[in-house]
Structures are given as structure tokens and as C-alpha cells.
Amino acid sequence: MPRGQKSKLRAREKRRQARGGLEDLIDALDILEEEEESPPSASACLKDVFQSSLDGASNNPHGLREAQSTSTSATAASHTRHPEGVNDQMEERPICTQDLEATDSFPRGPVDEKVIILVHYLLYKYQMKEPITKADMLRNVTQMSKSQFPVILSRASEHLELIFGLDLKEVEPNKHIYVLVNKLDLGCDAKLSDETGVPKTGLLMTVLGIIFTNGNCVAEEEVWKVFNTMGLYDGIEHFMFGEPRKLLTKDLVKENYLEYQQVPNSDPPRYQFLWGPRAHAETSKMKVLEFLAKVNDTAPSEFSNWYTEALQDEEERARARVAAKARVSATAGARSKVKSSKSSQLQ
């Protein structure tokens, strides 16, 4: 078979596999959407987990069915904001399990359905590493007037950011070309997606936020309590994120995003999570705090204690970068002097 034909067949098979993975995701979402007539929004679900924690609500995680509706938040279409003044009431407490009674549900309309379709479409383009244009979105996805496009794009962008950890950025405003950028400064060997192409960065940022707001070290049971409110259960396969325990204690640990260690002198043994070296390298406390602030529709500075700690971390990172550059410059200068000395001796 000619080489060109083989290349076309491989490309076609790659597209088929990508479509298959996302079609499986869409099928799973459709099933859960049928179970919940009015699923909560992407922002509302995460906001309720974090916001209720910050407000100090009583510990009372709801059952599996309600948590399942929470887990569909990546494709739910409603967009909500907290009532006025709610941020003024926030207290800085560690993120832990809290009830989700504030979760709102909304009727689904044509615009909401378009948001869901656009999220699917953008995830597909991200997996295929294909450019995203406004013209393609209008023609192939939204199929509606340009006046509705900004609202649909804004909501889809929020879901992608809060759940999948992807930022939608316009790279060529004149041509309306967009790209999806991972919130982490991923290395070349990063594997924060599975065979469906669903990025797990949003979930990782959530875990890093739990660790950060619990004094940079959190007991495993506290992470599971938050996971349960998000519809993630130990030993139960999740249609987007796989088996949570494997992801949390093996995959993310193997990738060096998390450290999983036994609590000293604990009997029976208990375990805790810390940031791994890769998390420190690819994100920062400030970026994680910005993520939490985005979830709660507020500014990072509203969380004064954590903001102060994040600022100190930024300053330390800046000093480390300056010191590293100085070392590189000094090394380069020393090598230049050695070469110059050898050259003069030869002459």
C-alpha cells in the first residue's frame, strides 16, 4: 500500500477513535441527564462544595443520586452567581465535606443544550489538537444567530475551566481563532487525560486546593468526603474520571503531582496527601487560589490568609528564578574566561 494512503488510513483511524471516546462520554452524560431533569450548573456544583465549606455549614454529605447529578456538572448548561453579599460572609476554613443544599437546578432550554454540545465539540478539538474557529463553532455547533454566541461561548468556557482545567483563549482576534490551554504548565510526558481525551486537570486543581487550604497537608478521609459530594466514590468507576482511588493514590502519585504517605505514628495506619514535586513545578499556590476564587466568583485577595501565603510563595519563586539565572550567567561567564585564557595561551 502506498505510504500516503497508509498515512491517511492512520489519520482516519485516529479520528474514529477520538470520536468513539467522546461519543462514549456523551452517551454516559445523556443517561445521567435523563435521570436528573434539571441538573445543576458546572459552576454551581463546585461553588457549593467550596462555598459551603467556607461558610462553615454542617457536615452532611447527600446520597449517591444527588452526587451523581453533581458529577454531570461538566455538561450542565445553567450559569449561576451567588446572591449579593455572600462573599462578605466567607470565613477562611479548610475545604472539607459540607452539604449541598444550596445546589440550584434550572430548566433546560435551547441555549443550554447548545452549551452542552459546544463543550463536547471543544473537548473533541482539544483531543485532536485541531484549531478552533468562531466560524466553525457557529456553523457546526451552535447554528444560531451571532447575538447568542457570546453567551453560549462564555458558559461553555466556564465549564471547561472549572471541571476540566482548560482555559479557552483567543490567539488571533482578527481571525477569531481559539485554543484550549491546560491550567498546568504540563511537561512533555504529562498524562492528565485518559483514552477518552477528558482532561483531569480540573479535578487535580480541586485536590491541590483542598491540600493548600488545609495547611498544605490533608488527611485522606477529608479528600474522600469532598470527592463524595462531587459524585466520586471509592471503588466505583466514574464515567469521566475512571476509578477515583486509582487516580488519586496511584496515577497522580506516579506522575508526581501528589505525595501519598502514612501519617506518622498512626495506628491503625492513616494516610495523608501533600503536593508532589510536579505540582510545585507546574502550578503555584496563587494559581490554585485563583481557581478557588473563580469557583466562588470572587478575588483571591478575599481569602486574606491564603492570599498572603500565596504571595509569599510567589516572592520565593521569583527569588529562586533570579538566583537560577545568576548561576547560569556565572557559569557561562566562567566558561568564557576559560576559553579566552586557553586561546591566549595557544597564541
From Swiss-Prot:
Keyword field contains Manganese: no
GO cellular component, one term: nucleus
Compositional bias of kind Low complexity: 67-78
Keyword list, A-Z: Tumor antigen
GO biological process: negative regulation of transcription by RNA polymerase II
Record field: compositional bias (Basic residues): 1-18
SMART domains attached to this UniProt entry: MAGE (SM01373), MAGE_N (SM01392)
Biased composition (Basic and acidic residues): 81-92
UniProt-listed InterPro entries: MAGE, MAGE_N, MAGE_WH1, MAGE_WH2, MHD_dom
Region of interest called Disordered, as start-end residue ranges on this chain: 1-20, 56-92, 328-347
Boundaries of every MAGE domain copy: 111-310
TM regions (residue ranges): none
PANTHER family: MELANOMA-ASSOCIATED ANTIGEN B10, MELANOMA-ASSOCIATED ANTIGEN MAGE ANTIGEN
UniProt name for this protein: Melanoma-associated antigen B10
Gene name of this polypeptide: MAGEB10
